[in-house]
Amino acid sequence: MLREHYRELGRVGADYARLPRLVHAPRERVFACWEGEEHAHAARARGRGVVFLTGHLGHFELYGAAMGRLMPMAILVKPLSNPGADAWLRALRNASGVELLPTGAGVRGAVRRLRAGGCLAMLGDQDARRDGVFVRFFGRLASTPAGPAWLSLATGAPIVFGSCLRAPDGRYEARLHPPLLPEGDAGDTGAVRALTARHTELLERVVRERPESWFWLHKRWKTAPPPEEA
């Protein structure tokens, strides 16, 4: 599995430079499977905005940009520590036609966008240190970003989890899951944790099916839970 994981990292890395071309190409040329689009439209029809969520799975950049071709999209991004790499990736994302919102200062813009019925794409599967909420991932408590669930609860926007994985013929398979509807208040830690656990469960399900596609090099369980949660 490790060998296949590194092979997949190389293939996706090679496709990064082609991101704008892939996004603007006819869908059937890029995607062998495009499944669950009705879930995106159903979520948007609720009029509360949509949080499109994925993990570091397959070509997650292509997932966000392709959804941006389907409906107006902003991507909440964390700037890279390397300025040169950050500028290169930002240029690729801009050429793909999506709006970029930086994490931190961009949160207010994200809330405004969702409350206006807009769409937001983000990642939610890396170690969030002490700022995260602890939910189980492969049976172990993992510090998980609270942002997706918090935004959903604060605005009423459903979460639509999706993935963009390599197909056997070299193209990609995009799949969207039914919307996760927010239940509770953004100020309720229990509600944030419960919704985070729900979308993390979807991620785990996909990773179990396609383990080579997830970014295993990240130290997902780096932050230990506090004693009262362990």
Name each model feature, range by range.
Residues 37-41, 64-65, 89-90, 110-111, ...:
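Short amphipathic alpha-helical segments and helix-helix/interface helices
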Residues 1-54, 86-87, 91, 97:
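Membrane-anchoring hydrophobic helices of lipid-metabolizing enzymes
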Residues 46-105, 127-136, 140:
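Catalytic core of membrane glycerolipid acyltransferases/transacylases, capturing the structured
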Residues 1-3, 44-46, 69-70, 104-230:
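Non-catalytic C-terminal accessory region of glycerolipid acyltransferases
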Residues 35, 76, 175-177:
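Residues in well-ordered beta-strands of folded domains
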Residues 7-10, 29-31, 54-60, 75-78, ...:
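Short, functional N-terminal and low-complexity linear motifs
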Residues 12, 30-31, 53-54, 79-80, ...:
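A short linear-motif detector with a strong N-terminal bias
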Residues 18-21, 33-36, 59-64, 82, ...:
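Generic structural "secondary-structure junction" signal
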